Amino acid sequence: MQFIRSLLKGFQEDAPAGGCSLGDPAATWSRLLQGRCSIGTGTRIDAARLTVRNPHGCSLSIGADSNIEAAIVLEAQQAEVRIGSRCHLGGGTLVDAACKIEIGDDVLIAFEVLIMDHDSHALCFDRRRFDVRDWMKGTKDWTHVTRRPVRIGNKAWLGARAIVLKGVTIGEGSVIGAGSVVTCDVPAWTLVGGNPAKTIRPLTDEERESL
């Protein structure tokens, strides 16, 4: 297990390859977040990584019986990530929060999915001129970066390499096709796909029962 990497002046902690059960990452991750971390019973952290750029007010919670293989990044002060119970976050997935990302219960997220609640940089060049330098120091100014919470409802399923952008709410039971770019809200129990993602059709009653 590798403790704080200073290269990016953030705080990072890797879970060991092969996975670990409740308790193995919990103490270290809680220390990085100054106690604001909880991991539910039976949750498996499998080669996951937590990066905390600035720990002030940041928090992370993961429910019970989930499997986490993703990288989770808390970019700014007060950033929050909430992951429910019985969720799967696949390898190569990045959950990148500068505001708040909330993932409900029974959510399936395939590999290499990107979920972001921010634009990363300001559109105005003068306001992003020193972003890289300050980001490496953990002192990046997020004041002029657009941030809006992301919420993924219970029972949703996100296909491989989907991208979910800031301010999006994905409704309960919805299915996001592989490679889709989700830029606006998705109604509950809806199949969407494409770039940008568009409604393909509502899920049938039979499909809803299977979810």
Model-derived features: positions:
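A generic "structured core" feature
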Residues: 175, 180-181
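Conserved coupling/switch loop of ABC ATPases
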Residues: 166, 184
